[in-house]
Regions:
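A short beta-strand-turn-helix
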Residues: 71-88, 113
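Conserved strand-loop elements at the edges of beta-sheets that form or border functional pockets
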Residues: 83, 92, 233
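A generic local structural motif
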Residues: 75-78, 107-108, 205-206
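Structural alpha/beta surface segment adjacent to cysteine/selenocysteine redox centers
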Residues: 86, 91-96, 102-179, 211-214
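Extracytoplasmic/periplasmic mature domains of Sec-exported, cell-envelope-associated bacterial proteins
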Residues: 62-71, 77, 134-137, 239-242
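N-terminal, intrinsically disordered, polar/charged segments of Gram-positive cell-envelope systems
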Residues: 38-72
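C-terminal cap of thioredoxin/glutaredoxin-like
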Residues: 2-43, 175-250
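Short clusters of hydrophobic/aromatic residues that line enzyme substrate/ligand-binding pockets
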Residues: 80-81, 168, 231
Length: 250
């Protein structure tokens, strides 16, 4: 083939290659945005999905009365750190494999340290199965720990998972964390392998979807009047504190 023919062929295919590159870049961008939104949490997109009205559009994060009705009430069945009769409830929908949840975990702990008995922390399961395949097994493991050893063991287990997700999200790691939380190894293994609490995990997830949660962490601040504020994503402690103070002063 002559040099002129090669040049002509190259010129002919250059626009095609350029178009293909643009299309590929577009789809990569869409995929990245979707994954990022899922992990960053909150209720972004809830209005479009007709899950819980326009929760994401609530001014200053405060929900309307109709929106608040969609958030499942806190009960004795919940995993609660503190008293469910505290002035403030922090209800978090979370995923044990989510890196943003790992980032938010110490932020929530800091709130409990500062506000003491004024606040309680409620943890609910919201595994993002499509991108976090170890989140649901970890949630099932946590429920096993709670059933076998109680609430304190559950929170110790959760703290361990979020202290080192890479280490503890394997089957062996979950077992190690369970034993360190006070559960007998054989008892845990029997419960975990039976996938005993999958329906409980799913019920938490469905409740979150009804409330408008589409990603993790997605949290609500609730005061004694039943007023609620949305806390979308792994917000800073300063942002969380501002919402708590607003709820206390309302």
């Amino acid at each position: 083939m002559s040099e002129s023919s090669k040049s002509s062929l190259f010129e002919r295919f250059t626009p095609v290659l350029l178009l293909a590159t643009i299309v590929l870049a577009f789809f990569v961008g869409v995929l990245w945005t979707k994954v990022s939104n899922l992990e960053k949490g909150g209720t972004a997109g809830a209005a479009n999905n007709n899950v819980a009205g326009d929760t994401a559009q609530a001014p200053n994060g405060k929900l309307t009365e109709d929106q608040a009705k969609n958030v499942p009430q806190v009960s004795d069945k919940d995993h609660i750190k503190g008293s469910k009769d505290a002035e403030i409830l922090l209800v978090e929908y979370s995923d044990f494999e989510c890196p943003f949840c790992e980032r938010f975990h110490p932020t929530a702990k800091q709130a409990l340290d500062e506000y003491k008995d004024k606040i309680a922390w409620v943890y609910r399961n919201f595994p993002l199965d499509s991108i976090h395949p170890r989140a649901r097994p970890a949630a099932n493991a946590a429920e096993c720990v709670a059933s076998l050893k109680g609430n304190d063991a559950y929170w110790k287990f959760a703290d361990m998972i979020f202290s080192n997700q890479e280490k503890y999200l394997t089957d062996a790691g979950l077992s190690e964390a369970a034993v360190a939380s006070g559960v007998g190894g054989s008892d845990f293994d029997s419960c975990y392998k039976a996938n005993k609490f999958d329906s409980v995990v799913t019920a938490d997830q469905q409740g979150g979807e009804t409330a408008g949660i589409t990603g993790t962490p997605g949290s609500f601040i609730i005061n004694k009047k039943g007023e609620m504020w949305l806390v979308p994503g792994a917000v800073s402690y300063e942002s969380l504190k501002a919402t708590i103070d607003e709820a206390l002063g309302s």
